[in-house]
Amino acid sequence: MSDERREGLAPEIEATGLVPMVVEQSARGERAYDIYSRLLKERVIFLVGPVEDHMANLIVAQLLFLESENPDKDIHIYINSPGGAVTAGLAIYDTMQFIKPDVSTVCIGQAASMGALLLTGGTKGKRYALPNSRMMIHQPLGGFQGQATDVDIHAREILDMRDRLNRIMAHHTGQDMETIARDTDRDNFMSPDTACEYGLVDAVLADRKALDQA
């Protein structure tokens, strides 16, 4: 039997809504992976859905694992997220900056709020959006009930976090703080071309050939 691997989707996943399984066959036998684990072998991470602590822990773990596997090879994060918790998103962002490999980011669908910050937090020159994706930036949301003094404490924390996020956005987009503060005062939606002009991404990709030329 040839050592060349043969891959195919396991038939039981058809029309079930379950995560597809990929079966690899070689001279050593068969092995089944869920599709995301198989793509992780190719250094592809999916950041999909609301950003929260459990999801952030999984993304951070995958980033650290891929760095340990090969610290000199790029990691690719595909983002389709409406945003979410600021602290969870910053855990992912800080890890992206901390590890040695370049981190390429690609917006598929949408990258809103914290999703947009993670998109623009990729390695300069390796941040992309697909043609029909959307990006949205805004200031952080928050609310608190309690004693007046505690409300004041939390209000000041939200303002401090807003400034921190604006500094990060300014650093990666090349926009000044005044522009970022103005443009994030309300929900600000961007097309891929507008996001590219703004500095959120570096290129809009219609196909893989465009990626080779980017």
Curated annotation (Swiss-Prot):
* Alphabetized UniProt keyword annotations: Cytoplasm, Hydrolase, Protease, Serine protease
Q: Give the enzyme class.
A: hydrolase
Spell out the GO cellular component terms annotated for this protein, sorted alphabetically and separated by semicolons: cytoplasm; endopeptidase Clp complex
A Pfam entry, by short name: CLP_protease
Decide whether keyword Protease is in the record.
Answer: yes
Location in the cell reads: Cytoplasm
- InterPro entries, alphabetically? ClpP, ClpP/crotonase-like_dom_sf, ClpP/TepA, ClpP_His_AS, ClpP_Ser_AS
Main location as per UniProt: cytoplasm
| Catalytic reactions on record | Hydrolysis of proteins to small peptides in the presence of ATP and magnesium. alpha-casein is the usual test substrate. In the absence of ATP, only oligopeptides shorter than five residues are hydrolyzed (such as succinyl-Leu-Tyr-|-NHMec, and Leu-Tyr-Leu-|-Tyr-Trp, in which cleavage of the -Tyr-|-Leu- and -Tyr-|-Trp bonds also occurs)
Q: Which family does it belong to?
A: Belongs to the peptidase S14 family.
Entry function = Cleaves peptides in various proteins in a process that requires ATP hydrolysis. Has a chymotrypsin-like activity. Plays a major role in the degradation of misfolded proteins.
Q: What's the subunit arrangement here?
A: Fourteen ClpP subunits assemble into 2 heptameric rings which stack back to back to give a disk-like structure with a central cavity, resembling the structure of eukaryotic proteasomes.
According to UniProt, the name of this protein is ATP-dependent Clp protease proteolytic subunit
Q: What is the lineage of its organism?
A: Bacteria, Pseudomonadati, Pseudomonadota, Gammaproteobacteria, Chromatiales
